[in-house]
């Protein structure tokens, strides 16, 4: 039986989603252990979006196979019971066809990056936003972001450790929303390169901070090298919002 779960987590104190050889602090391993504790079965979780250390999720999706059958609410409640001291929560569980794969069946992924743009420290949101002290010109950021829409070679916006064979990606939408000193950057696409969202955000922040001509984004794209783009935004402002199937 194949089960699909939707998961919310605070990624602050984890090594990321993926289980690692020299660390027992991955989100994947915590959930796999919780499933074993209530079912007695060792399972392998496959996720829709592998988040890095410090990145949060509002709607991560994962699947796993079990021989035993359980009522869906019991799966959700049992996993949550064994995770009760950990900031990981299963929001929903459902049965899916054996052809379903959390990663390869995904149609679109949605990320959101949260910024607080003010000089006074963000006392209540530390660890959940990137605080940028210099004033940002959001209109310039929006104009620069338009050049990233569509299909491009995004070599300038991937980490040096990115293992993707093909740097071509299609960005469906970038929406920059300002509410007072809070700025949320929403990005959606079917797939992303490693650190792509964080590098895009870091680059847009530099545009907004330095009042750079938005047309300069085309030059960054065309150089196809990591050094052309801006800094990598810190992980703690990034949220995996949801995944469409």
Curated annotation (Swiss-Prot):
Residue sites binding substrate per the record: 111
What CDD domains does this protein map onto?
A: PseudoU_synth_EcTruA
Active site (record annotation)? 52 (nucleophile)
Q: What's a single GO MF annotation on this record?
A: tRNA pseudouridine(38-40) synthase activity
Enzyme Commission number(s) from the entry: 5.4.99.12
Listed A to Z, the keywords are: Isomerase, tRNA processing
Reactions catalysed according to its record: uridine(38/39/40) in tRNA = pseudouridine(38/39/40) in tRNA
Cited Pfam families: PseudoU_synth_1
The UniProt entry, under InterPro entries, shows:
PsdUridine_synth_cat_dom_sf (IPR020103), PsdUridine_synth_TruA (IPR001406), PsdUridine_synth_TruA_a/b_dom (IPR020097), PsdUridine_synth_TruA_C (IPR020095), TruA/RsuA/RluB/E/F_N (IPR020094)
Q: What does this protein do?
A: Formation of pseudouridine at positions 38, 39 and 40 in the anticodon stem and loop of transfer RNAs.
Subunit-structure text: Homodimer.
**Family to which this protein belongs:** Belongs to the tRNA pseudouridine synthase TruA family.
This chain's protein is named tRNA pseudouridine synthase A
Recorded source organism is: Wolbachia pipientis wMel
